[in-house]
A protein has these predicted regions:
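Short, structured beta-strand-loop surface elements
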Residues: 64-124
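Short, charged/polar surface micro-motifs in flexible loops or helix N-caps
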Residues: 42, 50-58, 63-65, 76, ...
C-alpha cells in the first residue's frame, strides 16, 4: 500500500503501521465500526456492524437510511475501529493514557446489487459473527433481501495505530501509584433464550472468544 497525506499518521507516528496483516487482525477481533460521512457540509458518524474478508469491509443497512444514500452516491467515507486494551494510569494526570489498537479505512462504497451477492454476504457475515450459525438459522427470503442494502469498501487505503506497554512518566513521586489496568471483552451466558438448552455452536463461540487476550 502506498502511504499518502490522508493515510499517514502524523501524531506519534512511531506507533503507526500500514501492515495489512495487522489491519486484518484488528478487524477479525471486532464486531462494530464507526462510519464517518458528510451530507451537504454536515458531518455525521454512525456506528455499524461490519463483515470483512482480506480484500473488503462490508456494511449493510436499511435502504431508507441517510447513510445509504451517501454510499450509493459513491462519496468518500472513513471507517474507524477501536480495540481498547487497558487504562494507563500515570503519576501525573496529564500523562494518563490508554493502551489500544485502532484502524482507519478510507474509500468509496460499492453496492452489491444482485440477490445472489447479498445472500452470499449474509451467509458469510453470520458465520463470521458466530461460527456455525448459518447452519442453525433461516437465511433471508426475497422480501428480506430487498429490505437491506449492502456495500463494500476496498481495504487498500488505511492506517493502523497501537499503544502498548507501561506509563510514560514525567513525575517521579514515589508515594503515587502508577500502572496499567488491562481491559478485556468477555461474553456471558445467553439471556432471553428461546430454549433452556444452549446450542453447541453458541457454547463454542463463547468459549473461543473468552480465551482471546
Amino acid at each position: 500500500m502506498t502511504v499518502d497525506d490522508i493515510t499517514r499518521v502524523k501524531r506519534y507516528s512511531q506507533r503507526a503501521s500500514y501492515d495489512k496483516r495487522l489491519l486484518l487482525e484488528i478487524l477479525e477481533n471486532g464486531f462494530a465500526c464507526h462510519v464517518a460521512f458528510q451530507v451537504e457540509g454536515q458531518p455525521f458518524v454512525i456506528p455499524m456492524m461490519y463483515y470483512n474478508n482480506p480484500d473488503y469491509i462490508y456494511l449493510h443497512g436499511s435502504p431508507e437510511a441517510r447513510i445509504i444514500d451517501t454510499f450509493r452516491a459513491g462519496n468518500p467515507i472513513s471507517i474507524s475501529i477501536l480495540e481498547l486494551k487497558g487504562l494507563v494510569l500515570a503519576k501525573g494526570i496529564a500523562s494518563n493514557s490508554m493502551n489500544y489498537r485502532s484502524a482507519v479505512i478510507f474509500g468509496r462504497p460499492e453496492e452489491l446489487l444482485t440477490e445472489e451477492e447479498k445472500l452470499s454476504f449474509v451467509s458469510e457475515w453470520i458465520d463470521r459473527l458466530v461460527p456455525g450459525r448459518k447452519g442453525n438459522a433461516e437465511l433471508p427470503n426475497h422480501d428480506e433481501l430487498r429490505g437491506v442494502s449492502v456495500f463494500r469498501v476496498k481495504l487498500d487505503r488505511f492506517s493502523v495505530k497501537e499503544r502498548k506497554g507501561g506509563t510514560s512518566e514525567v513525575r517521579k513521586s514515589p508515594e503515587i501509584w502508577s500502572g496499567v489496568i488491562p481491559l478485556v471483552t468477555r461474553f456471558l451466558q445467553p439471556e432471553f433464550a428461546s430454549s433452556t438448552i444452549t446450542p453447541e455452536h453458541v457454547k463454542k463461540f463463547i468459549e473461543a472468544r473468552n480465551s482471546l487476550k
